[in-house]
């Protein structure tokens, strides 16, 4: 028998939905991340008595992390973290290679032109156009001193960094799921994550450079969110 975690979710800008819903159909038990996702699994024909809303798994992962101090992070990463720190990720969206390249270029230029800001870019998924995007990303960030690239940070480093982050920016589910749990604001760009439930700490933007720059600057001026003030979409 198969147990399915995080079923019922939508990501309209990626190919995940077809696989996710297929797994739902041959699973026996379902543990979803929100009430809306539970409803969707039931709409797909699953027995409501076997569908449970338990919230995102990331909450459990974060609760077991031994967070590193800022000094330890700087030592491990071999760089100085500014007060305004941004965690950034770009995954390819469904569409043409040229469109994805242009979106990434806009994203990099906006981040690179921010003043008094450190940007840590993590690697894109190696799915649709992933290798092409990673190659372009690693090449273009060389033009900007405030941007550093890390292939993989792992849970401990990533979540520890998030404690000192002013904003998570990009089109990764991390900005929609993990960032609110940590009390961190996020900017979700483009359509890759379109369809997911969002907290009030998430701001949406296109890849238009002026719009994106304006929204990042506004978020950087805000105080860090209090976890107790964040609406829990799992309820």
Report residues per predicted region.
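A donor-sugar binding/catalytic signature common to diverse glycosyltransferases
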Residues: 1, 5, 30, 154-198
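Leloir-type glycosyltransferase catalytic cores
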Residues: 36, 203-235
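Short, ordered loop/turn segments at secondary-structure junctions
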Residues: 7-10, 35, 124-125, 191-192
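A nucleotide-sugar donor-handling region in carbohydrate enzymes
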Residues: 26-100
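A conserved, positively charged/aromatic
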Residues: 11-28
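Short acidic-hydrophobic, aromatic-tinged amphipathic segments that line or gate anion-handling sites
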Residues: 32, 52-54, 149-151, 203-208
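Short gly/pro/ser/thr-enriched loop/turn and capping motifs at secondary-structure boundaries
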Residues: 9-14, 38-39, 59-60, 176-178, ...
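Donor-nucleotide binding loops and adjacent catalytic segments primarily
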Residues: 68-164
